[in-house]
Amino acid sequence: MANDPRKLLVTCALPYANGSIHLGHMLEHIQADIWVRYQRLRGNTVNFICADDAHGTPIMLKAQQMGMTPEAMIEMVSEEHQRDFAGFDISFDNYHSTHSDENRELASHIYLQLKKNGFISSRTISQLFDPEKEMFLPDRFVKGTCPKCKSEDQYGDNCDACGETYSPTELINPKSAVSGATPVMKDSEHFFFDLPQFESMLKEWTRSGSLQSETANKMQEWFEGGLQQWDISRDAPYFGFEIPGEKDKFFYVWLDAPIGYMGSFKNLCDKRGDLNFNEYWNKDSKTELYHFIGKDIVYFHSLFWPAMLDGSGFRKPTNVFVHGYVTVNGAKMSKSKGTFVKASTYLNHLDPECLRYYYAAKLNNRIDDLDLNLEDFTQRVNADVVNKIVNLASRNAGFITKRFDGKLSAHFAEPELYAEFAGAADRIAELFEAREFGRAIREITALADKANQYVDEKAPWVVAKQEGQDQALQDICTVGINLFRILMTYLKPVMPALAERTEAFLNQELTWEGVATPLTDHAVTPFKALFNRIDPKQVEAMIEASKAEAAAEKAAADAAKPKSAETELSKDPLAAEIEFDDFAKVDLRIAKILSCEAVEKSDKLLKFELDIGGETRQVFSGIKSAYQPEDLIGKYTVVVANLKPRKMKFGMSEGMILAAGPGGSDLWLLEPHQGAQAGMRVM
């Protein structure tokens, strides 16, 4: 490590302020926190920041549904988010909001600099517009029938059923997801960031060698496909920042969201006197800037964000660390199965250190998805943390307390063994630095196996019963406790709460430098249980609680959904398509009603005598509940004239009168416009 401590600014992607934190979010925040804690443990200066992403149409609409202002809702959600992160020991130096004065000033400044430097243009575009709510509709707020597979109730940008992507204007029977109204096309002036001007800079940044290979390869695909101008504006009504100098135009949420990193850091600088904002963000900054993000937002962080920074005179990120998604038991997180687990639900049932350890044990520096297998989760935490590591302390601490008043030996009996454990520090440090946490955990647990093997071979419980072996017993237990001390130092970034309890037991802080020298002639405190094993029933209870929460939320959401206006077509869908030749076989004619009478002993039928143009027909029709017979005499209607005569109980019916409606009293006879004559063909 260099003599001068590094200065690092580290961020996590900003959680959206319209919902709860779940175990998918926690992967990123735990990954970043482990890396940050490792850097601090090595003496580096780290500013670890985050904020809520608090703007956009979804937040505006959800606040309306909840009957509160967007400001009140995002404040409530922020409190929940911060409570969850604190519960998992995520050690942010500052947690802020994109809806802040700092962010407004920085977003406006960056936009105006980009505009001044010729990177902003405007043009008129056509978008779907909700005529009832009087608002333009984002793609995800339009629903309809997929133009490819014809699946109904699909979003305006892609079909969940067949995976097809499309424009919302291609949907069949599109409806606003906000009001249920049929959207119309409307023109509006929008503002665009000229991303193609930054292609050469972005290619050079990609070739720097610091980006993950998967990210660099993906960027190359985007370059080959051609970079496009980026729409950075949205029309009122919209919850966000107004664009300087424009009326009813707002910054798109993805413009001011990453600027939220800067806004949160600026807020931290204003709180403290020892931080200089410009030192970290100026174009020639010597500090390091790292973003931890999920693979779903690589596009914004690897293209738009560095280009915006470069075009407005700020530094670019040192690196962007991308991770995959979380699956549970090999499948996508599911609310119905209870595997879509909120952070708060987890905290109600299980120790956060368990998840921190399990995620660390499976994380690497690639963009791989991570599977939270709940059975493996239980077994691994119990086997590694309880049986191998914590048990190492409990096997030795009792003897030290009872037989030696808590005092460790004045000399260390196994210097070579200690040197082997301490010598692993550089190797484990390299793995932590490279975010190869899974490999680091494997190194640590391999050392734990050796430590337990040493204790098994020395068998202090046997030595304790032997006369005159007190010094040997104290030496063995001193070695065991020191090996435990090294292991817990290596695990300190992963399990900070367990490390803190270990420090209380050892009566000494765990430091990376301290690993070099064993702890001797030192008093430890009486041993208390440091960690509890996972009971599978706790996991089951968490899953059941998640199911119940999801069901309650779905019921509430369904009740709050705008009811789409029911149409006649939705109540009675179209029949299967027929060929034109089939339709051409039907002979529809205008008929004049010469007489009409009720059929005795029938609740539904009227008997008609019809003139179809020089020929008289007898027809029975089931519209008795809708009309009085005398009211129909002399009217014109439409009849199927070539329908094969049908013998009925009350006589022969020689055609079919056409009427519309669901039935009963809700039936309406089809009548032609004035001028139509009996016998005319209906074309």
UniProtKB/Swiss-Prot annotation:
Q: Where is this motif: 'KMSKS' region?
A: 332-336
Where does motif 'HIGH' region map? 15-25
Q: How is the cofactor bound?
A: Binds 1 zinc ion per subunit.
This protein's cofactor list reads: Zn(2+)
Q: Which domain of life is it from?
A: Bacteria
InterPro entries the record matches: aa-tRNA-synth_I_CS, Anticodon_Met, Met-tRNA-synth_bsu_C, Met-tRNA_ligase_1, Met-tRNA_synth, Methionyl/Leucyl_tRNA_Synth, MetRS_core, MetRS_Zn
Query: Keyword DNA repair: yes or no?
Result: no
- Where does this protein hold Zn(2+)? 146, 149, 159, 162
Which terms in the GO cellular component ontology are assigned?
A: cytosol
Q: GO annotations under biological process?
A: methionyl-tRNA aminoacylation
Write out the entry's keywords from A to Z. Aminoacyl-tRNA synthetase, ATP-binding, Cytoplasm, Ligase, Metal-binding, Nucleotide-binding, Protein biosynthesis, RNA-binding, tRNA-binding, Zinc
Residues noted as binding ATP in the record, renumbered to the chain: 335
Q: Give the subcellular location.
A: Cytoplasm
Chief location: cytoplasm
Documented EC number(s): 6.1.1.10
Gene Ontology MF terms in the entry: ATP binding; metal ion binding; methionine-tRNA ligase activity; tRNA binding
Q: Which NCBIfam families match?
A: metG (TIGR00398), metG_C_term (TIGR00399), PRK00133.1 (NF001100)
Q: Which family does it belong to?
A: Belongs to the class-I aminoacyl-tRNA synthetase family. MetG type 1 subfamily.
The annotated subunit structure for this chain is: Homodimer.
Protein name in UniProt: Methionine--tRNA ligase
Organism listed in the record: Vibrio cholerae serotype O1 (strain ATCC 39541 / Classical Ogawa 395 / O395)
